[in-house]
Amino acid sequence: LHKVIEGSEIKARTDLSAPHTVHCLGSEIIISMLGNATGEAPGGYLHLDKDFNIIGRWENSMGDIPFGYDFWYQPRHNVMASSEWAAPNTFMPGFDLEEVGHLKYGRRIHLWDFKKKEPKQTFYLGEDGLIPLEVRFHHDPDSTHGFCGAALSANIIHWWKDEAGEWQWEKIIDVDNEPHPDWPIPVPGVISVILLSMDDRFLY
């Protein structure tokens, strides 16, 4: 164990809590944080230097984003994609299906201006994208294609930039739900993790 960054220090310096995804920049690190110091959404992004010291918050604005979760970026296209889960105060007590209908869980994917560090476009996925979790861009740094697994909808969402330079999205995989006597609705496939092969040919 090299270093511990105490949650109390993060809260005091950035008003953030509930770390999730860690990604490296050229010589620095950003971590998605799902809540503020009191566990309310949307949280933000913790920025660390190469020695794991806190710089502050990475983003300049969260815009209208209601929730945070995973993120990934393609710097050559000046874009970052982020997904949504829920506020720590919502998911920490345990999952309640009714809270999805009360809009306490996410259903959007956000595209960011990576240089400006602020969101610029949102895909509202609706019922096709309930609780979109892991996001992946192609490993090819020139590609604009990305994917996200929507856990509760049990769907795979695909996005890309078209020939006109506009971002588009579509549902490409829909896993059937299965009936269960103890559930009020058919049990979804719950796609919790997705993975792209290193040659970008296969999605797992």
Language model region names:
Residues 2-75:
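Asp-box/WD-like beta-propeller blade repeats and closely related beta-sheet repeat scaffolds
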Residues 3-15, 58-66, 119-130, 168-189:
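Surface-exposed loop and turn segments in beta-propeller and other repeat-based domains
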Residues 20, 69, 133, 144, ...:
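Structural signature of WD-repeat beta-propeller blades
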Residues 24, 73, 137-139, 196:
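Residue-level recognition of a conserved intra-blade site in WD40 beta-propeller repeats
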Residues 26-28, 76-78, 142-144, 199-201:
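Short coil/turn segments that connect the beta-strands within blades of beta-propeller domains
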Residues 30, 46, 81, 110, ...:
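WD40 beta-propeller blade core
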Residues 32-41, 83-104, 159:
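Short, conserved, GDST-rich strand-edge loop motifs in beta-rich repeat architectures
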Residues 42-53, 99-116, 158-161:
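Beta-propeller blade signature
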